[in-house]
């Protein structure tokens, strides 16, 4: 369980800070921002092949997409970069069609080559990805054509679609150009928010990606996560209205925040920030 507090609409962050409300990107988000107090430091980079820190992992839920993703509040799977439900060809073969019109934040289209590359770099032992353990049932990944990818499994696996959520699709052309270290520091994805900047012990800044055509577009134009590991600092920021929402509310501060007309909720966290 996790306690979080917010003021009015600032608490409407079911999921990870409010992107998970299905509606089209619209002009009415212009000028809307979210400032939130986060309890975890920036402990790793953002490359989804290697990122394991709580804050960058949560940030990646906005920056990147998998073929299938899990809604962070309900944990229900939904089609992200997959345009159709995964098609089972036989007991150990699955095919997935890519979502039409998906683009990365640099404007380049998301391709099947990017999908194959994203899985292969995680499966490559040389990369020592933590996430390979979640897809160790996959034998190979290959392109069928420019819209479809095929997965061959080592054995039948009932949770195939759910495990796809562990792999986020990255732009091969960007990593080839700038290298893994630069990509780790300044990620480029296809999700509803673009990465703007990150400063250790300060904040992570995002902005809405207007061309995003997936299920859950951004509902605000800009989002800033203030990295406030100290609980007293988070509470002070919330009370002073520097932030609209905070997570991990200290138990001893609950009554005081409620007396100041703050909404405080206790929710199942699933180990995520702002569940």
Feature locations, PLM:
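N-terminal export signals
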Residues: 1-20
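C-terminal segment of N-terminal export signals and the immediately downstream linker at the start
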Residues: 16-39
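Alpha-to-beta junction loops
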Residues: 34, 115, 147-149, 239-248
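N-terminal lobe/hinge region of extracytoplasmic solute-binding protein
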Residues: 37-90, 120, 188
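Gly/Pro-rich hinge or "lid" segments in bacterial periplasmic/extracellular proteins
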Residues: 71-76, 164-218, 222-224, 230-232, ...
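Aromatic- and charge-enriched surface segment that lines or borders ligand/interaction sites
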Residues: 84-128, 150, 237
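Surface-exposed binding/hinge segments that line
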Residues: 97, 131-175
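Extracellular/periplasmic solute-recognition and catalytic clefts
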Residues: 140-142, 196-207, 224-275
């Amino acid at each position: 369980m996790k306690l979080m507090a917010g003021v009015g609409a600032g608490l409407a962050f079911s999921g990870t800070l409010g992107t998970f409300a299905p509606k089209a990107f619209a002009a009415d988000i212009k000028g809307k921002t979210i400032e939130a107090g986060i309890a975890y430091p920036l402990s790793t980079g953002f490359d989804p092949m290697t990122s394991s820190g709580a804050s960058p992992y949560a940030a990646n839920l906005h920056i990147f997409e998998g073929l299938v993703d899990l809604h962070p509040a309900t944990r229900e799977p939904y089609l992200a970069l997959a345009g159709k439900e995964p098609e089972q060809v036989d007991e150990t073969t699955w095919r997935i069609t890519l979502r039409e019109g998906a683009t990365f934040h640099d404007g380049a289209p998301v391709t099947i080559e990017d999908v194959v590359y994203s899985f292969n770099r995680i499966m490559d032992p040389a990369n020592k990805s933590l996430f390979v353990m979640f897809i160790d049932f996959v034998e190979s990944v290959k392109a069928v054509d420019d819209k479809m990818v095929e997965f061959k499994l080592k054995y039948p696996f009932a949770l195939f679609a759910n495990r796809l959520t562990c792999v986020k699709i990255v732009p091969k052309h960007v990593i080839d150009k700038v290298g893994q270290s630069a990509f780790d520091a300044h990620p480029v994805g296809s999700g509803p928010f673009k990465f703007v900047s990150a400063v250790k012990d300060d904040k992570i800044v995002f902005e809405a990606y207007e061309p995003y055509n997936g299920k859950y577009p951004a509902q605000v134009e800009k989002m800033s996560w203030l990295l406030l590991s100290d609980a007293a600092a988070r509470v002070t920021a919330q009370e002073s209205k520097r932030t609209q929402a905070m997570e991990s509310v200290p138990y001893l501060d609950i009554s005081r925040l409620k007396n100041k007309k703050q909404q405080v909720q206790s929710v199942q966290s699933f180990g995520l920030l702002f569940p």
